[in-house]
Amino acid sequence: MGMTAKRSSRTSGSVAMDDYLEQILHLIEQKGYARPVDISKNLGLSQASVTNMLQRLHTEGLVNHEKYRGTVLTEHGRSIARAITDRHETLTRFLRFFDIAEDTIYHDVEGMEHHVSKATLNAIQAVVKVLESEPEFLARIKRTLGEQA
C-alpha cells in the first residue's frame, strides 16, 4: 500500500494518516492492541517511519501510547478510523455486486476511499441498498455489463 501525503479534507488530513488510523483500528479489533512492529509489518514500512507517524498522530490528538497496551486511538482518532473503515466497507460492498476480482476491488477501494466525497458516498450507499433489495435490477445491470465486455 503506497503512502503518499496528499491532503484529504474528509478525514484525518492526509492519505498516509488515514492508512495508519485504519490499520491501528484493524489491529486493535483483531488482536486487542496495536504495536508499532505490527503496524510496520502490515503497512510494509520501516519501524522508524511508523514511529515518526505515530508521533505525528499523537501531536494531532488521534492516538496515545500506553505502556503494555501499545498504541491506542483517542476518541477523535477512533471516530476518524471508523469513518475510514465504513467508507472502505461501503465501496467494497458496492464493487462486489459486479463480480469484480477481489484483488482489483482492494486496489480500487484503496485509491477511492481517500478521495470520495460525502455526497458521492451517500449516493453509493443508496445504490447499495437498492441493489440489495432489488435483485432483478442488479441482474439487468450485470446483463448490460456482459454486453459491454
Located regions from the model:
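Canonical helix-turn-helix DNA-binding module
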Residues: 36-67, 75
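Short, Lys/Arg-enriched N-terminal segment that forms or immediately precedes the first helix
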Residues: 1-12
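Helix N-cap / loop-to-helix initiation motif
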Residues: 46, 99-103
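C-terminal regulatory/oligomerization modules of transcriptional regulators
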Residues: 110-149
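Residues within the alpha-helical elements of helix-turn-helix
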Residues: 42, 80, 97
